[in-house]
Amino acid sequence: MLFYCEFTWFPGTSRADVARRVVQQHDAGANNPERIHGWYNLVGGGAGFLLVDYDDPAELTAFLQPYMDLMSFDVRAVTQNTYGETIEGLREVAAQTT
């Protein structure tokens, strides 16, 4: 399942703090890069989001926990919509409710 993991650094967290932790987790083999489908930082720094693929929410939690002293997370399961199919489905819903 695909998860959207929005993160915001806690006040006082520095770029160096985050860099050290990310590299530490990478070197330990704990970042699971094959599960990361996207990693985006917001302009201005200190926030962003990951798109990650996990079947087990407990595994996702274990992936995020080493960072939880540096940043907060808002995690949501997401699904992908195909535009054309979604429009057709919405047409059907709209027709039923009028």
Where are these regions (language model features)?
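Conserved short beta-strand edge segments in small beta-sheet-based binding/regulatory domains
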Residues: 70-81
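Short S/T/G/P-rich N-terminal loop/turn motif that feeds into the first structured element of a domain
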Residues: 1-31, 35-46, 55, 80-81, ...
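Conserved catalytic core of Hanks-type protein kinase domains
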Residues: 53-54, 66
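Short connector loops at helix/strand junctions that flank enzyme active sites
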Residues: 44-47, 68-70
